[in-house]
């Protein structure tokens, strides 16, 4: 049952990604959301993109799906006519790295945690230009547009290659898929993700960032530190409830039948429904 449940989650995610890649991207509009100082967020289809513009040029965090590359370039040009110099990947999923090949072919330097390159390179369909050319294990810094931009790997969380991106001068943090604002997150257990690691990473970020920082989520609206705290509290409480029921000998079917408290209902209206979230926690616990 454990293997079947994990397979089902993985298969569902792959299927959803495939459908997304086949959709009509001509109808997608790229929206520019001002964040702070020279930092913006681009919303379109896929993971939110962080943007730094300035005298050094343009740096982006993630690049959504490949068919959106031209629209992303147009949005970037509206912000700054300079050259795109860097692409920072928060992890390897296609809705965050799909534009890599396009931007890499135009001489943007792609940087990511070591496991991101390994996972992208393991895909026979990956182009050389799509692969990160600079990788790191724990941390790296890019000094660009007058500030230090930190890439920090806290260990397994959403995947085994997550990076939290901190724009130190602008007081902005891009969480990648370590933050789904207002929704249950997808945790890729097959790619080294871990519910305990996910919670640990969010807690560590909250300990370090200023209370007035702006927080760019992987999915959802631009957030605040309070939003991230609320998200973390949800993670801790729902995981605790499932762990308690597992310890009491309840099955996955029992857990799904019981559900979660009503206050978490709205979290299950996104990609990950309540049953899927319970199953994710359950499978993560079984994998320990």
Annotate each predicted stretch with a short phrase:
Residues 29, 34-35, 57-58, 65-67, 115-161, 168-169, ...:
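Metallo-beta-lactamase
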Residues 38, 52, 62, 76, ...:
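Divalent metal-coordination and catalytic microenvironments
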Residues 30-74, 165-167, 172-175:
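Conserved beta-strand hairpin/beta-sheet module of binuclear metal-dependent hydrolase folds
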Residues 45-49, 58-60, 65-68, 91-97, ...:
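Solvent-exposed loop/turn segments at secondary-structure junctions
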Residues 32, 55-59, 67-109:
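Active-site metal-binding motif and surrounding structural segment of the metallo-beta-lactamase
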Residues 14-22, 207-208, 212, 221-288:
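Accessory terminal helices/loops
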Residues 5-17:
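Bacterial N-terminal signal peptides
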